[in-house]
Amino acid sequence: MLEPFPPPVHTPAMRLTVHGKHFHLDGSPHFLRTVTYGPFPPDARHSPDKDFPRVRRAGFDSVRLYALPDRTLLDLAAENDLIVIATHAWGYGCDFLREKPSLLEDARRTLTNWLTLHKNHPGLGAVLVGNEIPSDMARWMTPWKVNRALDTLIRDAQRIAPGLPCAYANFPTTEYLEPPSADFTAFNIYLEEGESLANYLPRLHHLAGDRPVFLTEFGLDTARNSEEAQATLLPEALRLSREAG
């Protein structure tokens, strides 16, 4: 378990922003401690009204969702002093530029409509416009064209919700997908040794330039690693991330 947070303080005006290489919360530098929540199989039993208080008590201050949440879920997060990192899930796993261009247009429309409704919600912290486009598809569609499409989504979001941090959740196989308009660099990485993480973090900061780095997924293969192994790596990962900036 992470060291406990102070007692929750409900702040209706709470807002996550980007200042240079760092995130700020309500104007002060803030180190996000995020846990992924979902996606869940159709028959899974999960209850956010019970899970979110547990997430907060475990020492996390934010949850990454793999969808654009409705008002009820955003309200529940805010009530538990959790920041929501929303992910726009659309058909980016196929050729959305030549074979199915309507997917991208639908994605733009869905994102702008959702942001119009929820951009000022105190529980919303940031938006990811996609997650891990398969490397073979990215190469097939041409990397710079994929980057341009992702950048279009980000600029749409920034136009509708100025100041709301937006990015794309990348992974090491497609380092070249780094939309220029992104407010921060987001990466999903699974490195099972602290030394490997320590060696890769400087690479991420190099890719990010003057933007913050946010590890949007991190952990171990739970089928092969015990809870003890996970509990050992997590504090080390937090320490290394802080040291890397």
Where are the regions a protein language model picked out?
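Extracellular glycoside hydrolase catalytic/binding regions
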Residues: 139, 145-244
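Short, positively charged and aromatic/hydrophobic N-terminal segments
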Residues: 1-3, 10
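Active-site mouth of glycoside hydrolases
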Residues: 10, 17-18, 24-185
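Hydrophobic alpha-helical segments, principally membrane-spanning helices and signal/leader peptides
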Residues: 11-12, 202
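A short, acidic/glycine-rich surface segment
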Residues: 19-22, 195-197
